[in-house]
């Protein structure tokens, strides 16, 4: 039996793709699919961990996630650097506070860029000079009130804003 063998030298990428961590709610059934659809064809690697959230959706229950953020973030590629962490909870970010969410995430992953849906939305409103928005949410009135107050405070400081809820 004659076996021919060829050596092929592997060609590895010198740089790895940027690593994106996604903090998803334990009750969110679509975020991974949605996130992958948005990031389709981008040269990045996505790593997900879930954070426990409680029903019913109230500001008090949203605030309970604050204490979990650091430990859940640490479990995304433990000991490894991650370029970006996306905390996928608009209402939780608003209830807890963008700066507090960022602080907790960066305790677990120092130097990473932190984003949330509301952070990205506000950046987009500013970049596109949006002057009028409509907000449609699945939230109860008490949470909607918190969101509308936040948007009015965050955006109207920069320019005149009409908020339709």
Give a label for each model feature.
Residues 1-71, 141-144, 148-165:
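N-terminal glycine-rich anion-binding loop in soluble enzyme alpha/beta folds
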Residues 17, 43, 82, 111, ...:
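A general structural motif
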Residues 24, 94, 136:
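Glycine- and other small-residue-rich loops at beta-strand/loop junctions that grip anionic moieties
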Residues 38-41, 79, 108, 127-128:
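Alpha-helix C-cap/termination motif
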Residues 55-58, 93-96, 124:
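Short active-site-adjacent helix-start/loop capping segments
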Residues 73-117:
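Glycine/small-residue-rich loop that forms an oxyanion/phosphate-binding "nest" at active or ligand-binding sites
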Residues 101-104, 108, 112-165:
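Conserved beta-alpha
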């Amino acid at each position: 039996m004659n076996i021919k063998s060829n050596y092929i030298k592997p060609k590895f990428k010198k740089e790895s793709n940027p690593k994106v961590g996604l903090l998803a709610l334990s009750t969110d059934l679509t975020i991974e699919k949605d996130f992958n659809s948005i990031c389709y064809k981008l040269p990045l690697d996505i790593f997900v961990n879930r954070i426990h959230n409680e029903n019913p959706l109230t500001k008090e229950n949203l605030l309970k996630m604050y204490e979990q953020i650091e430990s859940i973030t640490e479990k995304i590629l433990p000991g490894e650097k991650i370029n970006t962490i996306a905390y996928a909870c608009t209402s939780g970010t608003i209830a807890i506070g963008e700066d507090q969410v960022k602080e907790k995430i960066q305790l677990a992953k120092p130097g990473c860029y932190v984003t949330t849906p509301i952070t990205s939305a506000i950046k987009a409103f500013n970049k596109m000079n949006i002057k009028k928005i409509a907000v449609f949410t699945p939230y109860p009135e008490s949470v909607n009130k918190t969101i509308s107050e936040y948007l009015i405070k965050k955006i109207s400081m920069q320019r005149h804003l009409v908020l339709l809820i």
